[in-house]
Structures are given as structure tokens and as C-alpha cells.
């Protein structure tokens, strides 16, 4: 037995000494807590038992029953403790001592409790029982903690075996000895990982659980690399890099083992978690948003102004760094600068309003408007910063394997100069991944997601030099089989780690931002690709086409991963269909056209390149990505969409990238307002309308939305499979929604001609609906249903005609003294009203078509129904709700957590009369 020190007791488990303090009753595992919980409940209930009422005399039956329950529970603890003591000779003496203490305190508790149950009104007896209960719980807790240390002992025993195996691996001098030691290490490490997994599930402290999980993953992941690196070192001991390579992996494995040891003994390997915490810039914006709202009475011109201005300048400095980064597009940089200036101005306006309201208790309308404007401007700045971050992600995570593969190819050739060049490129690539990952973290409030990204980035940072070392070893020993195996192992480890980092980054990047940015990037690349074709640059064409292929593939992968968060439904079906079309049809055609074009340019035979066909294929890629984005956004309400994430800022292909055929020329190049600077399309003009006119349009849109709710309840419930009436109705509804979006300066319709073409599509769909519905009416006997159905068809024809007339909406824009005056309220409201009326007519037509089809069908006259009326299966809720970035802190509030009370602390709250004196 080892001697106890002043702080605690050293318990000798065979050759393993565990230090523990008998006075420290901290419960670290859930199993101890759950085992102790029933006894705590029984004891505290007994202590809280009230005496009989004044009218009645005698014993408390309830107290007597509780005493018996406590005695039985104590007896169970004694039996289990003795069993554990005799099964584990290393701890028998300590366990039996703890069991004796439980017996002693249990007997004292039993006597005190029975005396109390005989006389529940006695304060003295209640106080005696409280002290006895406290002593009993302390003894039982000590017994359980000691029993829990048996599991720790077994874990540490396995851990020491693994440590011995690592020492043998380190000192192995031959391949045979190394392989024998490695097999033994593999078995023992596997057993240690299992025991550590069990311990991880038991631990209460989330930080310790995370540390143990990371250590287990590290031990498991690095085992293969440890083998190959050790084989290289044993085979080529003359190479310094081989030792460096082996020592790095050995240290990683040893660190993992040490972490398991620390956690098993209740020590965190990291006093402060360096990876935790939300992004700095996101947190600064949140703090600023909270700071701008205050009571005007508390506003201080000197203190408040200085504080808010300093906070804002700090945010703008960080935004400027992001704007000046390499991958930030010029257009994005200009937008960030513009938003920073707008936020500055909004803050000055807000501070002026606070100055004017300092003597008022309630906010004036001007102050409320200034606060709203301030919030809007910070939200706009956030959005541009998020887009800038996604710009970097889209570029840096586009091709993550090429730098490594180039490095490996250079290493295989044995060309040291080339390897040095490729190593520099690979290092810059790794540094860029880490830099972008940290940039993504800076704009995220998702603390768990940020922690994962930071940890994955740290792994990339530490692994990069060792990948280069493995390549350098292969360079000087290109024919060595063990060097080749080692390089393959490091390549696989790198690819896995990059995939983990990519997925972690995607998790804290909203898919809406990702798709909006990817769409713009693909548009840029399509322009470059066509330009390369037109100037005959085969190399640039191949490189740019590769970027398009990579971006498109990544869009497909990210969207498929996002759809995994949903249960299968009509929404996911449509999105995945759009992905399938892009991947299997559009990209296949594009790849063929690129191959043909590159081949023709390489052979200097420009005449063989069908430029128009190539441009068509390129345009289809852009349209395919755009269609995926449109499908993803279909389940968003207008409130969920911010204006910059919708379709409005995306411009179509520029003139030089369009086909020269007549099919691709037309209104797309037309400036609808050639005399007005800053406005090109009718949709842009709609955004410039006065706030008063916008409010009136919003009122009309609200009426349209109410009609849309009726449409959803009456039409959307039907399955459109085998029912063209429902299909046409939904198609018309979608176009009408795009039209109403246009009146607010949103949506995919940009020009007046777009709206006119949309009206034509509605009219065509209305004609088809009329024809189909009349066939149903003809089969229906004369009745009020038939008459009403035909009447509603006449309404559809009328309102389709009205929409065609009102679709020629074009806001009148005048420039008076440098100020744009936009007037188009009447035409916009007319279009919305016509759409609302048409939707109402469509709803009624569907209702009466159903009645006519099912209620009045004559027997024997129709071989099969014209349409099939089948209820659509209810759409399932997403397994994980898409998280909007502004919701993380702005709308989601953390509920008060239930505090888990330590049993000893619970009992210490009871105070006996004797203690109080």
C-alpha cells in the first residue's frame, strides 16, 4: 500500500497508482449519478416529510415506509460493494473500508430515521436525521466513486499495455520485429479504443467527452500511417526525413494515448478549448446590433457615440481586410465598401435621432425609422460579407486534389527540383484552405460548427509538412516499395482530412449563399470559356472548362448533401431531378463539346468548331445550375429570402458569349431605359418606386397571397400525377407568383418582354385547361355543377385576356434635377388584381371539375376517366430545419437550462435546529 499524502490517497491498483481525495465527492460519470439518484430521492423525501396534523396523533406511516426503502437501498449498496471488492483483488481493502463506512452510516441513519418517524414533530429528531442522511449519502457516494475507479483502472491497464507496444514499435530494428509489434499494437489499441468509447458514454463533462472522442479518432486514424512511416524508417534509417515522418505520427499517437489517460483521471488535456467560440466578426456584428438599441434617456453623446463608433470601425476594418483578399471579386469588393459607407451614414443618422430624443421617454417615429434603417444596413453588410466568404470557399475548395497529385507525380519521377516547386504550390494550397476555413468561421454564429471547422483546419495544418516529407522520401527512393506505400497512406489521409474540412465548412455555410455565389462564378467561367474559344486559346479553354466542371460537380454534391437533411417528398424529388439533369445530361453534352473544341483548336482547325453549338452547351450548364437553385428555393417563403439571395442580381450572359444565331439575340441586350442612368430593366425600375407606392403594392400582394392560401388548400392537396388539370393549375399559379414578385422588383422576370411572355404562357395553359375541363363538362349531365363549371371557364378566358393586357407593365421613369421619379403603381396593381382574379377562377374550376368528374359520371358511357383524382401524400417535414444565418442569435433564444444538483449539495441545504444555533 502506498503512503497517503496531504492532499489525498494514492490507491495502488497493481502497478498503477491512482490519486484521489476521499473528501472530493465530485461525480464525474452518469452511471454513478443514476445509481445514487433513487437513494437521494428517498432520503430527501424522508427529510421533507411533514408531521401529522394537529388534530391527529401517532406515527407517520409514510415516513415508516420511506425508512424501510432507505434501509433496503443501503443494503443493496453494501452487497454490490462487497461483490466488487472480492472480484478485484487490487482494490479489495479500499472497497471493504468504504463498505464498512456505508454500513456504519446506514445503521445511524436507520436509527435516526425511525426515531423521527415515531415523532415527526420533533425538531431535534429531524435535525439528527438530516445529519445522519448527509453522512450516509457521503459514504455511498464515496463507495460508488471508488467502484467507478475500477473501470478507470482497467482502462489505464490497457493504456499502459499500448504505451509498452509503442515503445517496442519505436525501437524495432527489423521489418519482422516491426510487423510483430504492429500486430500486437493493433490488437491492444483496438481494445483500448473500445474501453475508451464506453468511458466516453459515461462521462458527464462534455469537454472531457469531446477530448476523449478526438483522442480515439486520432488513435484509430493514425495507426496505418504509423505502420507505413515506421516501415520506411526501418528500411531507410539513413534518411533524416524518414525519422521526422515516423516521429511525427508516433507523437500524434502518443498524444492521443496521453489524452485518454488524462480524461480517464478527470483531467482535461486542454484547460481552455482553443477551438470553441463563435466567429469574431459575426460576434462583433451581433454585439453592435444589440448596442444600437437603447433607451433615449440613457443615451450619452460622449460615451454612447464613442462606443458605437469604435465598434463599427472595428467591424469595418475587418470587413476591409475581407474585401481586399485575393479571391474577393471586384464587384463584391465594391459592394462591401458601399455597404460599409451606408452603415456609417445610418449610424450617424441614428445618433442624431438619439440626440433629438434624449429628453423623451418614448421613441419618436423618426428614431424608430432610424433604428430600422440601421438594422437593415447591418443586415445588408452581413450579407455581402457572407457572400465574400462563399466567394473564397467556392474558389479554394474547387479543386482540392490536383496540387497533391502533381506533387506525387513529381516525387515518383525523382526530380528534386520539380518536387520543391510542387511542394511550394501544395503548401500554399494548404495554407489557403486553412485561411479560408478561418474566414468562414469569422462570419458564423454556429459554435459547434465553428469548432469542427477549426479543429479540421488544425489537422490540415499539421499534416501538410508530413505529406511533403513523404513525397521527399519517395523522391530520393522512387523505387522503394515502402516509400510508395507510405506516400499512398499519406495521400489517403490528406484526402480524408480535406473532405472532413470541406463538409465542416459546408455545414456552416448556408446553401442559399453557396448557390447564389456558385451561379455567378459559373457565369463568369462560361464567359471566359467562350472568349477562349473565340480567340482560339485551347489551353485556357481546357482550364476554364475544368473549372466549370468542378463547380457544377460541387453544386451537385452540396445540394445532394442538403437534401439528405429532408425526408423524401415532392420538394426533394424536384431538387434531385434538377441535379440529375445537370449531372447526367447537361454536363455530358458540355464535356463532349469541350473535348471537340479543344481537339479542333489543338489541330488548328477552327472551321471544325461549331461555336453556336458550344455556346448553347455552355448556356445549358448555367441554366442547369440556375434551375437547381430555383428548385432549392421553392420551399422558402418570401420572408425567408433576402433580396440579394434571390434571382435579381444575377445578370445573363454578356454579349460576347452569346451565340451569333438569331435564336440568341433579342430583348436580352435591350436597355429599356436608355436615357436613364442606373436603370436598365423594368424590374429595376420597380425597386426605385416611392415607399408609399411600394406599400400600396404590398397591400395588393397580400390580397393575392390570401388567394394563394385558398389555392394551396384546394388545389395543392391533389396529386398532379395523371391529372393534367392539377398540373396546369399549379403551372399557372407559379407564373402568377413570378408576376407579382416582378411588381416588387423581385423574382426571375426582369423585363417587360419577360412579363409579356409569361402572360402568353398563362394564356396557353388556360387554353389547355379550358379544353380539358370542357371534356369533363360534356360527360357531366345537365346540372348546376355543369353550368357553374362552364361559367368559371369563361372567367378564366376573361382573366387570361386581362393579364395579357396588363402584362405590358412598364414603369415610367423620369430624371428631374438628378432625382429619379418612378411611376407605375396603376399598371402594377392592375396586374396583381388580374392575377388574383385568375387564381380564384382556377381554384373554382378545379373544385367543380372534381365534382363533375366524380359525382355525375354516367355508368357505362366512359371507358376510363379523363383525369385521375388522387390525394397527394402529405409532405414530410425536414429532419433538420435549414438554418438562416440571422436566426442564430437574432431570433433563437436559449431556454433556461435545468440545473443538475449534486446530491451532497441538495442535502446540505437542509439545516437542523442544532446547526442553526
UniProtKB/Swiss-Prot annotation:
Disruption phenotype: Mutants die at a late embryonic stage with severe defects in head morphogenesis. In embryos, RNAi-mediated knockdown in the hemocytes has no effect on their developmental migration during stages 10-14 of embryogenesis.
A biological process from GO: dorsal closure, amnioserosa morphology change
Entry keywords, A to Z: Cell adhesion, Cell junction, Cell membrane, Cytoplasm, Cytoskeleton, Membrane, Phosphoprotein
Region Disordered, annotated ranges: 878-905
GO molecular function, a single term: actin filament binding
One Pfam family linked to the record: Vinculin
Membrane topology (UniProt): Peripheral membrane protein
Coiled coil: none
Superkingdom, taxonomy of origin: Eukaryota
PROSITE patterns, alphabetized: VINCULIN_1
SUPFAM superfamilies the UniProt entry points to: alpha-catenin/vinculin-like (SSF47220)
Positions carrying Phosphothreonine: 643, 645
Phosphoserine modifications at: 659, 662
GO terms under cellular component: actin cytoskeleton; adherens junction; catenin complex; cytoplasm; plasma membrane
Biased amino acid composition, Basic and acidic residues: 878-890
Subcellular locations according to the entry: Cytoplasm, Cytoskeleton; Cell junction, Adherens junction; Cell membrane; Cell junction
Entries under InterPro entries matching the protein: Alpha-catenin/vinculin-like_sf (IPR036723), Alpha_catenin (IPR001033), Vinculin/catenin (IPR006077), Vinculin_CS (IPR000633)
Effect listed in the UniProt record for changing residue 645 to D: Decreases animal survival. No effect on head morphogenesis
Subunit structure and binding partners: Interacts with arm/armadillo protein.
Function: Associates with the cytoplasmic domain of a variety of cadherins. The association of catenins to cadherins produces a complex which is linked to the actin filament network, and which seems to be of primary importance for cadherins cell-adhesion properties.
Name the record gives this protein: Catenin alpha
Gene field: alpha-Cat
Amino acid at each position: 500500500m502506498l503512503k497517503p499524502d496531504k492532499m489525498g490517497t494514492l490507491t495502488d491498483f497493481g502497478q498503477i497508482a491512482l490519486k484521489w481525495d476521499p473528501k472530493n465527492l465530485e461525480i464525474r460519470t452518469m452511471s454513478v449519478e443514476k445509481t445514487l439518484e433513487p437513494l437521494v430521492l428517498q432520503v430527501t423525501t424522508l427529510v421533507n416529510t411533514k408531521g401529522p396534523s394537529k388534530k391527529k396523533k401517532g406515527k407517520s406511516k409514510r415516513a415508516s415506509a420511506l425508512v424501510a426503502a432507505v434501509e433496503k437501498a443501503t443494503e443493496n449498496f453494501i452487497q454490490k460493494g462487497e461483490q466488487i471488492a472480492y472480484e478485484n483483488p487490487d482494490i479489495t481493502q479500499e472497497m471493504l473500508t468504504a463498505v464498512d463506512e456505508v454500513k456504519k452510516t446506514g445503521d445511524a441513519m436507520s436509527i435516526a430515521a425511525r426515531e423521527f418517524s415515531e415523532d415527526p414533530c420533533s425538531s431535534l429528531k429531524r435535525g439528527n436525521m438530516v445529519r445522519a442522511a448527509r453522512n450516509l449519502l457521503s459514504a455511498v457516494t464515496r463507495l460508488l466513486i471508488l467502484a467507478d475507479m475500477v473501470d478507470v483502472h482497467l482502462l489505464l491497464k490497457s493504456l499502459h499495455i499500448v504505451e509498452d507496444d509503442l515503445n517496442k514499435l519505436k525501437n524495432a530494428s527489423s521489418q519482422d520485429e516491426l510487423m510483430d509489434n504492429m500486430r500486437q499494437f493493433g490488437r491492444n489499441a483496438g481494445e483500448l479504443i473500445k474501453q475508451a468509447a464506453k468511458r466516453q458514454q459515461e462521462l458527464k463533462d462534455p469537454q472531457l467527452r469531446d477530448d476523449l472522442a478526438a483522442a480515439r479518432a486520432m488513435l484509430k486514424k493514425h495507426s496505418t500511417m504509423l505502420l507505413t512511416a515506421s516501415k520506411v524508417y526501418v528500411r531507410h534509417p539513413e534518411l533524416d526525413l524518414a525519422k521526422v515522418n515516423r516521429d511525427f505520427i508516433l507523437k500524434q499517437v502518443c498524444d492521443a494515448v496521453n489524452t485518454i489517460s488524462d480524461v480517464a483521471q478527470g483531467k482535461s488535456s486542454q484547460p481552455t478549448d482553443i477551438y470553441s467560440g463563435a466567429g469574431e466578426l459575426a460576434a462583433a456584428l451581433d454585439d453592435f446590433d444589440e448596442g444600437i438599441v437603447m433607451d433615449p434617456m440613457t443615451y450619452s453623446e460622449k460615451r454612447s457615440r464613442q462606443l458605437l463608433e469604435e465598434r463599427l470601425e472595428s467591424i469595418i476594418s475587418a470587413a476591409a481586410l475581407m474585401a481586399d483578399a485575393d479571391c474577393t471579386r471586384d464587384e463584391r469588393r465594391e459592394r462591401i465598401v458601399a455597404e460599409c459607407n451606408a452603415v456609417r451614414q445610418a449610424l450617424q443618422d441614428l445618433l442624431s435621432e438619439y440626440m433629438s430624443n434624449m429628453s423623451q421617454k418614448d421613441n419618436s417615429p423618426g428614431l424608430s425609422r432610424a433604428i430600422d434603417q440601421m438594422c437593415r444596413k447591418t443586415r445588408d453588410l452581413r450579407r455581402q460579407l457572407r457572400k465574400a466568404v462563399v466567394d473564397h470557399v467556392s474558389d479554394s475548395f474547387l479543386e482540392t486534389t490536383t496540387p497533391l497529385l502533381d506533387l506525387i507525380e513529381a516525387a515518383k519521377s525523382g526530380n528534386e527540383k520539380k518536387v520543391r516547386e510542387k511542394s511550394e504550390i501544395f503548401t500554399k494550397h494548404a495554407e489557403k484552405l486553412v485561411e479560408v476555413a478561418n474566414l468562414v468561421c469569422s462570419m458564423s454564429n454556429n459554435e459547434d460548427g465553428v469548432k469542427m471547422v477549426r479543429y479540421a483546419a488544425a489537422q490540415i495544418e499539421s499534416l501538410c509538412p508530413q505529406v511533403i516529407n513523404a513525397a521527399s522520401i519517395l523522391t530520393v527512393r522512387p523505387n522503394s516499395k515502402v516509400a510508395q506505400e507510405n506516400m499512398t497512406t499519406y495521400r489517403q489521409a490528406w484526402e480524408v482530412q480535406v473532405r472532413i474540412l470541406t463538409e465542416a465548412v459546408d455545414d456552416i455555410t448556408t446553401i442559399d449563399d453557396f448557390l447564389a455565389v456558385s451561379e455567378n462564378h459559373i457565369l463568369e467561367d462560361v464567359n471566359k470559356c467562350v472568349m477562349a474559344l473565340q480567340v482560339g486559346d485551347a489551353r485556357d479553354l481546357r482550364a476554364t472548362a475544368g473549372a466549370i466542371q468542378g463547380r457544377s460537380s460541387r453544386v451537385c454534391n452540396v445540394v445532394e448533401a442538403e437534401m439528405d437533411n429532408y425526408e423524401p417528398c415532392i420538394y426533394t424529388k424536384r431538387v434531385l431531378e434538377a441535379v440529375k439533369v445537370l449531372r447526367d445530361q447537361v454536363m455530358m453534352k458540355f464535356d463532349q463539346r469541350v473535348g471537340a473544341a479543344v481537339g479542333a483548336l489543338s489541330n488548328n482547325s477552327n472551321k471544325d468548331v461549331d461555336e453556336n453549338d458550344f455556346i448553347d452547351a455552355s448556356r445549358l450548364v448555367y441554366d442547369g445550375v440556375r434551375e437547381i437553385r430555383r428548385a432549392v428555393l421553392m420551399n422558402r417563403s418570401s420572408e425567408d429570402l433576402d433580396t440579394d439571395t434571390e434571382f435579381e442580381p444575377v445578370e445573363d450572359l454578356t454579349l460576347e458569349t452569346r451565340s451569333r444565331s438569331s435564336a440568341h439575340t433579342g430583348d436580352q441586350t435591350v436597355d429599356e431605359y436608355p436615357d436613364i442612368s442606373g436603370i436598365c430593366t423594368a424590374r429595376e425600375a420597380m425597386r426605385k418606386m416611392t415607399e408609399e407606392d411600394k406599400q400600396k403594392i404590398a397591400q395588393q400582394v397580400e390580397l393575392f397571397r390570401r388567394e394563394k392560401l385558398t389555392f394551396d388548400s384546394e388545389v395543392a392537396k391533389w396529386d398532379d400525377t395523371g391529372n393534367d388539370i392539377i398540373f396546369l393549375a399549379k403551372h399557372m399559379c407559379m407564373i402568377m407568383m413570378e408576376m407579382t414578385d416582378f411588381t416588387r422588383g423581385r423574382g426571375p422576370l426582369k423585363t417587360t418582354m419577360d412579363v409579356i411572355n409569361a402572360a402568353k404562357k398563362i394564356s396557353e395553359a388556360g387554353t389547355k385547361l379550358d379544353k380539358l375541363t370542357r371534356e369533363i363538362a360534356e360527360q357531366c349531365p345537365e346540372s348546376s355543377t355543369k353550368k357553374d363549371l362552364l361559367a368559371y371557364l369563361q372567367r378564366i378566358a376573361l382573366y387570361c385576356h386581362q393579364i395579357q393586357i396588363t402584362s405590358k407593365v412598364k414603369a415610367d421613369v423620369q430624371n428631374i434635377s438628378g432625382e429619379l421619379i418612378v411611376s407605375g403603381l396603376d399598371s402594377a396593381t392592375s396586374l396583381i388584381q388580374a392575377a388574383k382574379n385568375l387564381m380564384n377562377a382556377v381554384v373554382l374550376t378545379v373544385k367543380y371539375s372534381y365534382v363533375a368528374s366524380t359525382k355525375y359520371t354516367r355508368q357505362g358511357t366512359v371507358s376510363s376517366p379523363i383525369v385521375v383524382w388522387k390525394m397527394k401524400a402529405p409532405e414530410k417535414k425536414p429532419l433538420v430545419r435549414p438554418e438562416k444565418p440571422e436566426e442564430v442569435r437574432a431570433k433563437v433564444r436559449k431556454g433556461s437550462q435545468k440545473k443538475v444538483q449534486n446530491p451532497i449539495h441538495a442535502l446540505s441545504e437542509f439545516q437542523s435546529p442544532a446547526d442553526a444555533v
